Amino acid sequence: MDGQRQQTYIPAPPPPSATQPSQSHMLSLPPPPPRHLPTQPQGVMPPPPPGPPPGPPPGPGYGASKLANSQLQQQNNLGWQHNWARQALSQGFLPPPPPPPMVPTNQAYGRQTSFSVPNADGPITSATYVPGSNTFGAGVGIPGFDAHTRPSYEAYGTMSGSDRIRGPVHHLYESSGGDGSAYKRDGTVPPTPSARTMPSSLALHDNAQESVASSLPGATAQNHQSQTGQTNEPTKSPSHRQNNSNTLLGGMSPSEAAVQWPLDRVLLWLAKNGFSRDWQETFKTLQIEGADFLDIGHGANGRGNFNKMHNEVFPQLAKECEASGTGWDKERELGEGKRMRRLIRQIHDDDSFDVGIPAQKRRESQAPSEGAPDTSPKLSHEPQSAGPHSGTIENSPNLRAPQLAQPHRHSVQMRSVTLPIPTTHDIASSDFSQTDGISSRSDFSRSVLVGLGVDHRRQSPSMSSDNGNLVAPFRSYEDSPKSGSPATQHATLNQGLSSSSTGDLSVKYEHSRGNSSDSTMGRRYYESRKGQETIRPSPQEMCSRQWTGETSSSYPKEHKGIFNFLKKRSKGGDSTHPSPEEPNLESPTSPVNLRQNGPHLPYTKPSFNASDMSLGERPSSASMSDHERLRGKPAQKGKKWSFVTLDGWNYRLVDITDMDSVETLRAAICHNLGIADWASAQIFLTEPGQSDHEEPLNDTMLALCRRTKSDSIGSLKLFVRGTHLQPVPNHVPNFAGLGVPLPDKHTASPTHHLPRKPLDDEALSRIPPQPQTGPASPQLGIRPQQPKTPAAKFPARDAPQHTEGMSPVEGDQQVGISPEPDKADLLARHEEHKREVERKQKAYLSSKGPPQPRNDSYGETGYRRAGVIDFDERRVSPYEDKKADTLVPLRKPPSAPQESYTLTRINSLRKKDGDRPRAQPAVQTHGLGAVLASMGRMTSAIGTPAPSVPTPTSAGGKQTNFGSFGSPTQGNTKSAPQSSPEKESLDNPGNPAEHRHTKSTAPEIPKPTLQSRKSYGPEFDFEETEVSFQRSPRPQDDSDEDSDDGLFAIPLSNNKASTKENDSGSGTSEAQKRTEKPALTVNTESRLRKGLSVSFRSPSATRESFADANGDSGGREGASFLMAASPEDERPTPRRDSFARGDIWASRPPVEGVIDNLDDFFPDIDLDAPYLDGQGVSPPSSPANRAPPENDLHKKENQPSSSYTGEMNANAGDTLGSNEPTLKPQGGDVVARRNINRSGGGLTRGKSIREVAKGANQASRSRSIHTGNQKSGEILRRKSTKMFGAKIMQIKPKPGSRLSQLDPIPQNNTPSGVPQRQPTFRIIRGQLIGKGTYGRVYLGINADNGEVLAVKQVEINPRLAGQDTDRVKEMVAAMDQEIDTMQHLEHPNIVQYLGCERGEFSISIYLEYISGGSIGSCLRKHGKFEESVVKSLTRQTLSGLAYLHDQGILHRDLKADNILLDLDGTCKISDFGISKKTDDIYGNDSSNSMQGSVFWMAPEVIQSQGQGYSAKVDIWSLGCVVLEMFAGRRPWSKEEAIGAIFKLGSLSQAPPIPDDVSMTISPAALAFMYDCFTVPYRDSSERPTAQTLLTRHPFCEEDPNYNFLDTELYAKIRHVL
């Protein structure tokens, strides 16, 4: 039979193929078993079940079977008979019996031994296996149909004798395949793979087989033909050199390598793996391809061809680099060479010749060069599934010997035929196949499969034909007429399987199977394939792998290829991790699944020859269970997962197990998220809920995080910020190999996922409202909204998230909706909620279809990073707070101290009357006024002129005057416009004001309210007093300064009747003016009076002012303001809790800011309590108090901007006499008594702390105003009073109590005019404003002269003092040293030490107060400084440093935090806690120890082992400060302390200057830093001195055009308060 078959069918006529089309439909008919049963004497193989045989193509498989044992031959023959029978039946030809001579031939070669009879475990392992109902087509074990018409197919005639016997069949197939219909029709008959369709290795094996079977007459000719044809193909590549030893390169023969790796593909591989154009040109020039290319990484010795690299590649590369202008960098290129060798080794190890080449690349390389359907991208490589290989020999696991000849095939080693092929290379493979394949292969294959990475992307040697493509599979799919055909479906699956998400498609251009059950289960195709597809890898494939030296271990490595990241990348949407929304997912049993993975699997591993590939595992259900087995294995292998997110809301799981390179990892992460430009994407570490991310991970940190933080539970979470998302290729239709478009998979975006229902009303209500008419584009819609709502703070890309949860359309519509005005407040209050919503929306939007280019988004992101938006919303400018405070009383005005207790009580009862309509109080005012007036006269010895009553009553306006004088005006001032009324009242205290008031009689009507206050009695006088607004006469008229008024600490109604009359007249006008801006007016009045030294006003006046403060604000405006509220009510919300507030910490306000906010900085002190006038120690206060009221008014008028401040100052300065008295009513008597007691029984003039402070500040301010320079620095820079040698009393109130309720402020006993030998200063300590080396710094004020100062205090806990005496001694010694060192220093750039006070458990140092804070705090808050500022600050610091060194003082702790920056640009060196005085300032002192801050230390400080160091360590520290100012961060910013110590001490390295600094600053600045960083080798003599740098260095030259007020830094820090 066999002989007949050979004779009859060797020249298989093509015509029968024409019949095959019809036969293709008959494939389902089972072949007649009886005919062949007899031919199978051994019956080793069970008779194939009826039905179309999906078994492997007869070609190689048959050849292998013939080479195999007689049993195998018989089995093969049986298979042949089945296949032939079917074909014969369909074609009308009887299947020829297998040729018996083949067995002896095979036996002669000993191949039979290498191929064992299939085990019972693998019942259907032979190539003749008849597929069952659930197994059919190329994907289920039957090789894809081969392109018989191809000339290479004829070369297939070179197959072994058995193949030649089947030759007729081949011919038959070829003829039928000519039109492709044969394949379609004869789907049951596995196409005989031609040399092309089958891997070169297979073809070679065939040759070898034929050579072996050359004894057969007809075979030899064919054999020679096939060999010749095959040899020619591989020789295409000029670099296709065969190893003489015929060893395989990476599992490929040299010919195969030439086909697999043509030059184009090598160049593409280089490009994809990031090799420069120079490398590509080098390879192109040297024509490195095929075996030469693979030799580079995996030469004969397994280590790569180093000679070639160094003798040819690198020299040529150097030329290319020079030619291209890149420049030759040997280290870089050597590193690239190493990387290349490693990547090429991966190609060998992974059995994937495409390693490192994206699937797309592979697609190109795999595209059928022989006319295979290029149009089917998926088919390009995937169709190769069962393809010719499986069909040939792979399907019959027992027939592997032929592959051994593979490596020799191209070398045309006929000797391969003569030599026992199995022994050459197949020994390993045959052993493997027999042992592992049959017995242990299932375990082995499983373990191997688990590790497989991207086999489907790589074509194993067996997978690919000599051309690099499995032509047969393509043709089979292509030719298959219907998508329903197995081949078609397989192809379709490939397309559909491309990846679960379109994003995947964009990432991998290969046809990954997404719908397979494997993908559903997350298994790899090869893994699932093992169970699903029974096609066993041909022995050839196994041989090729074995020849590459691959073992099972190599398989697991496969997934480590660079490609792997592509596969992993698709995890989010990959077939291995399909999203639940994927519509194409099919049940595990779906034939689609079976075919999906099939194409690659058989070729993925030789292990598939094992019995575990038996049919029993083919059912998808089996694959399902198999998957579950396999699924656990990756975890066992240490799978590493990472969660990645674009918005912090939606996370995708990415498998980063095999991402060995950072580029691969980045690309995988970005492709998973749909970011096309992964190179520019930023990756941050994140945690759920984290919204702010500081610095993106660089490559090193990313690799470290992957290595240390990633694990099997996804502990590593990454936030990715890309320029824009990669558009999902939804528009690119998926095509099966047959060109049938497949439904596109849903992208990861919500639009393509399962449809989502629109948000319900409740959900929508939670979203910031937006107009329904918003534009459809979410981003565009949001833009208009931004200016209106807080949403504007967020980048547009975030904003779109408002539509979270909506359908894309709805989301678009609603995104643009602007919030309704009525909800603006709600949005502001719920910003956090809004952020969350926006975050969700961003995620939603980002996933919605191809995202629109977010040009604005990026900019907004940058803007957001700048912190402008969020910062502004969260923090209200303290400066604004100050303004608000200005408008309202800054403190609760205490009761007027002047009033008697009775009056106080009466006024307290009547206090609310002022709130009543002015008209009513006016009437009552007279009645009560008389009573109260008499009472006031009696108690306070104050006579209120009768005119006072008439004054208010006479004219409403005049009453208004009266009232205006009172607090009503003051209250009005607060509420009324500041500048104009104030100016008017101040400017026109006289008639003009009166005219106004007369005009505004209505406002005067409220003034009866003032009268109502007058009804209290004393208010009458008070009002009149106020009426005496006139600056000159009245204040001076206060001849009563020493009157009883002082006794009661109540401002005397020093205004005489005339004064009152004047007040009534001018006061009226003033009241009107004050009505316009009463607060200022009132303050001015009080200020005037105080200026006249009449510090006390009649209680009524005080009361009025108090009432005004409470509610008379309406008095000025008339009935419009009925201020019934108490002073507390009118008082604004507290401006600030304290200096310690986080956002204001270390930002010290200017002195005037402190004065204006004394209550905030000295919260527990009654700043308005009067105390005896100090000794002559407080010159600033007395002149201020004595200053004529005109001065105050003039100041206020000149300073409209600070009018409120002026007003406050006036009021505060007036304290007791101010319109807004602050003492409690009962305080008056007490204070009076105290004054009497303290003064020795005599009456003295009382002053309050507020008065003194404001007086001093006013005088200083007036000076600055007159000079035309309003810089706060000038005010601050006034000379402070030194207190060394004086007696200092520090007053610090107990928490929660006011000084007025505690012991009185210490009074000076000596008369003010008599100087004391030892002056006494009373220092009041306020809020904490900073921390020093050993102590805390508090705000202080000198109660005697009003100077603001800083109190540095070290307090020792008495309980700890006994325990840690050494620490206490150290602290005390440090403070003493600081005091002794600094008390005599005076320099504009050194903080002035004013005095000290030693207590039992504390030491206090009084320092000059510097506003603005330290340079370090400015750097942290505002970033690096511009060079002009750095230059100025450096020059000033050098000046101070030169002065210190001249005085013999080493600072030793110079850093940005210890240099204070005034608001006028002056910097001062501070914190001399560890400074030291020495005689030889620039000589090394061995007693100098290691002190200071590590990052600013000089090397000699750390290295000082008995040698010591000099003051030049301060020069080094100064260089560090300059670097700190330029860089915006400390020196050694990337080092920890220990690292800096090592580099300084051991390596004597200077802190590195960052590139962004060195590239932007001037050469002079660089030179200055380098000079400061001069590293001493023996001593520091080479480092310049401070004086040298100051006078000679170009960087320290003064710039005449420099003005700090014009700098950006000043603009940032000017509003400190």
From Swiss-Prot:
Phenotype upon loss of function: Results in severe sensitivity against cell wall-disturbing compounds congo red or calcofluor white, and drastic alterations of the fungal morphology. Impairs phosphorylation of mpkA.
> The Protein kinase domain covers which part of the protein?
1323-1596
Kindly list any coiled-coil regions of this protein.
none
Which residue ranges have biased composition labelled Low complexity?
Answer: 19-28
Keywords, A to Z, come to: ATP-binding, Kinase, Nucleotide-binding, Transferase, Virulence
Which ranges are annotated Basic and acidic residues under compositional bias?
Answer: 524-533, 832-841, 871-885, 1128-1140, 1189-1198
Q: Where is the composition biased (Polar residues)?
A: 220-248, 482-504, 535-555, 586-596, 897-907, 956-980, 1199-1208, 1257-1272
The protein's matches in Pfam families, at most eight in alphabetical order, are given as:
Pkinase (PF00069)
Domain of life, per UniProt, equals Eukaryota
Q: What is its EC number?
A: 2.7.11.24
Q: What are the transmembrane regions?
A: none
Where does the chain bind ATP? 1329-1337, 1352
Q: Which GO terms describe its biological process?
A: MAPK cascade
InterPro entries per UniProt: Kinase-like_dom_sf, MAP_kinase_kinase_kinase, Prot_kinase_dom, Protein_kinase_ATP_BS, Ser/Thr_kinase_AS
Q: Which reaction does it catalyse?
A: L-seryl-[protein] + ATP = O-phospho-L-seryl-[protein] + ADP + H(+); L-threonyl-[protein] + ATP = O-phospho-L-threonyl-[protein] + ADP + H(+)
Comp. bias regions, Pro residues = 44-60
Q: Where is this region: Disordered?
A: 1-73, 167-199, 211-253, 345-399, 455-555, 568-633, 739-820, 832-1144, 1165-1277
Known SUPFAM superfamilies for this protein? Answer: Protein kinase-like (PK-like)
Secretion signal, residue range per the UniProt entry: none
Q: Which SMART domains match?
A: S_TKc (SM00220)
Summarize the protein's role: Mitogen-activated protein kinase kinase kinase; part of cell wall integrity (CWI) signaling pathway composed of pkcA, the bck1-mkk2-mpka MAPK cascade and the downstream rlmA transcription regulator. The CWI signaling pathway regulates cell wall integrity and pyomelanin formation. CWI also controls oxidative stress response, gliotoxin production, iron adaptation and asexual development. Finally, CWI is constitutively required for A.fumigatus to cope with the temperature increase found in the mammalian lung environment, during infection.
Which family, according to the similarity comment? Belongs to the protein kinase superfamily. STE Ser/Thr protein kinase family. MAP kinase kinase kinase subfamily.
- What is the name of this protein? Mitogen-activated protein kinase kinae kinase bck1
Q: Which organism is it from?
A: Aspergillus fumigatus (strain ATCC MYA-4609 / CBS 101355 / FGSC A1100 / Af293)
